[in-house]
Amino acid sequence: MNFPYYIAQKVAFSGKKSFSRLIICIATIAVALSVAIMIITTAVVRGFKNQISDKIFGLWGQIHITDASIGQSAEVTPVDMKQTFYPSLDTLRHIEHLVPNKNFLTSKSDPFTPKKTKGGIHHIQVFATKSGIIKTKAEIEGIILKGAGRDFDTTFMTKSLVEGRFIKFQDSSASRDIIISNYTANRLKIKVNDKFVIHFLDQNQQQLKRAFTVCGIYKTGLEEYDKKIAFVDLSMVQGLLGWKKNQVAGFEVFIDNIDDIEPIAEYIHNEVLPNNLYAESLRDKFKNIFEWLDLQNVNEIVIIVLMAIVAIINMITALLILILERTEMIGILKSFGTNNWTIRKIFLYHAAIIVGTGLFFGNLFGLSICYLQEKYKFIKLSETDYYLSYAPIELHLPTVLLLNLATLLLVVLFLIVPTYLITRISPVRAIRMK
């Protein structure tokens, strides 16, 4: 029989009313709330980052293939659609790449080790863009037309449509359909099936006009992009730019797993593309927004550390009160020859029972809040500030299990120090105090 654990159980579940029962109750609640907040924080941060990333990647893909001279001039250099990798690049699955070897400095192994990506490429599509100005009777608004071809993946756009339909392509001529954002529609007071004119400048700075009919209205919540982007037939953009049917601004590549974005981008650039083309990940292209998303990791860590400190302080306080209240018991055990470490283990087991109870109720509360938020979305956000209208939830079971295990081990580890007080208790004095 495990003697310390047996005594700890008897003490913990004795049912005796005392001041320490109140302190234990407070400590249990503190641990429960700390764990619940940790779980909710990790779920919200994970959901927040993934949903915003999905929106950006849904609009633009994860990797762009463009002319190598992009960024060196204001003019966009067209790329020939007839490439050896198009459209067969979407058959690329797992690729092997090299990652730094963490044990390189402590062993004689190679500095890099081979590793396979988690997924591959599931889609590739062409795109082209052209800036213009929408002019209605009431307002004027700048806009960027993004050309969508027949290879356009409509999955994200279908989910983002709040009204109307996607573009209907025509065989004989470019479609006049246009999909505008909800922001643009409200600002210009435009509805589905309304017509309006967009003004452009051609290569010779001559003014062009094109009439469009609104076929759909979308909303991503990314106001920075919703303000600017409208979707039209790719052929329309090619015509406005004076390009041939086989000329586009580039290719958008969609991958299976976001963790593979860097190795796949490097593989495409080094192994697939000719010298005149360049592959760039969206993380590099839109650094600001992804750096902002990465900052959420710092917030997550700060909250978890603070909650861990709260749990530790409350448990230390509770343990010290338990020791002081059980001074007579400690004296009796010492008088029977029980060593200090065995007695310390009794209180550590008792503390572990308290922490375990707190973990149970903390998980129950935290997971319940996550479930209710996922189902009813009762915690609302300002979409203008956060790109989302509600707090997103994405639970990750390994993370939840790790939080529970780390909290239990960390708290119990910190409680070893205050149990040192037991070694200072004299059995004679402890018994006399009673």
What are these regions (language model features)?
Residues 345, 357-403, 416-424:
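Short helix-loop junctions at transmembrane helix boundaries
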Residues 320-322, 329-374:
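Transmembrane alpha-helical interface segments in multi-pass membrane proteins
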Residues 1-35, 54, 434:
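N-terminal Sec/SRP start-transfer signal
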Residues 420-434:
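Short cytosolic juxtamembrane segments of multi-pass membrane proteins
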Residues 14-25, 257-313, 322-324:
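Peri-transmembrane interface segments
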Residues 21-46, 294-329, 352-361, 409-413:
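Hydrophobic alpha-helical transmembrane segments of multi-pass inner-membrane transport and secretion
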Residues 179, 188-280:
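Basic-flanked hydrophobic alpha-helices used for secretion and membrane insertion
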Residues 36, 43-142, 170-171:
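Hydrophobic, regular-secondary-structure patches
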